[in-house]
Regions:
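Conserved phosphate- and dinucleotide-binding cores of soluble alpha/beta proteins
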Residues: 56-200
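N-terminal active-site beta-alpha-beta segment that forms phosphate/nucleotide-binding
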Residues: 1-90, 200
Length: 200
């Protein structure tokens, strides 16, 4: 119920800041899906582009960024692009992937986004979803990681203690984006939210 209300409020906020020729990047996740589900059909804005902020993770296609991008674009009568790659690959593979023209073009557009919509997760839960091993998860805990957003793991002071390789949005990129919409709620995520938001 809390997440549903947050989704409605976030959709309402997005509706208020939309304008012509605007680029929206969004991550996957249950919270971001709530925004997309609650977004009304809007046709008055022209030249809106919707993009995934990163690749897709997990087995649940319904909450992957590419799926949510297509759904949001449909509601906004907008154009969209997809990023067809697994989110969690190593740096050498990322370098290779970024040389592919079609991916390079999408990534350049992602970095020029006007609005970034993202969820915030608990560090250990997100590490498991991203396929990190128990040893790596233990290392994250030792480093004080409490929250995760766009593949970055944050401690209580909002410092990035670890980040997964990506062709999409990274922590420093997020800071350059004009409007950030973080969607998260519930007591269990309080520490994660404070950690991530201290960075911004």
């Amino acid at each position: 119920l809390v997440l549903e209300e947050i989704g409605k409020s976030a959709a309402n906020y997005l509706k208020g800041i939309l304008k012509n020729k605007c680029t929206i990047a969004l991550t996957g996740g249950t919270s971001v899906k709530r925004l997309v589900d609650n977004m009304p059909k809007i046709t008055e804005h022209k030249d809106i582009l919707v993009l995934p902020a990163r690749g897709g993770i997990g087995r649940n296609v319904e909450i992957q960024s590419n799926t949510l991008v297509a759904k949001l674009a449909e509601k906004l009568s907008a154009d969209y692009r997809m990023l067809q790659l697994i989110d969690n690959v190593d740096y050498a593979e990322i370098y290779e992937i970024l040389n592919e023209e079609s991916i390079k073009e999408v990534v350049e557009k992602i970095h020029k986004a006007d609005i970034l919509i993202y969820g915030i997760g608990k560090a250990d839960e997100m590490a498991r979803k991203r396929g990190l091993g128990e040893e790596e998860i233990l290392r994250l805990k030792e480093k004080g990681a409490v929250g995760e957003a766009f593949g970055c793991y944050f401690n209580n002071n909002g410092e990035i203690v670890f980040s997964t390789p990506t062709a999409g949005i990274k922590g420093e990129d997020a800071k350059k984006i004009n409007k950030l919409i973080a969607i998260a709620g519930g007591k269990s995520k309080a520490e994660a939210i404070l950690g991530v938001q201290s960075y911004n």
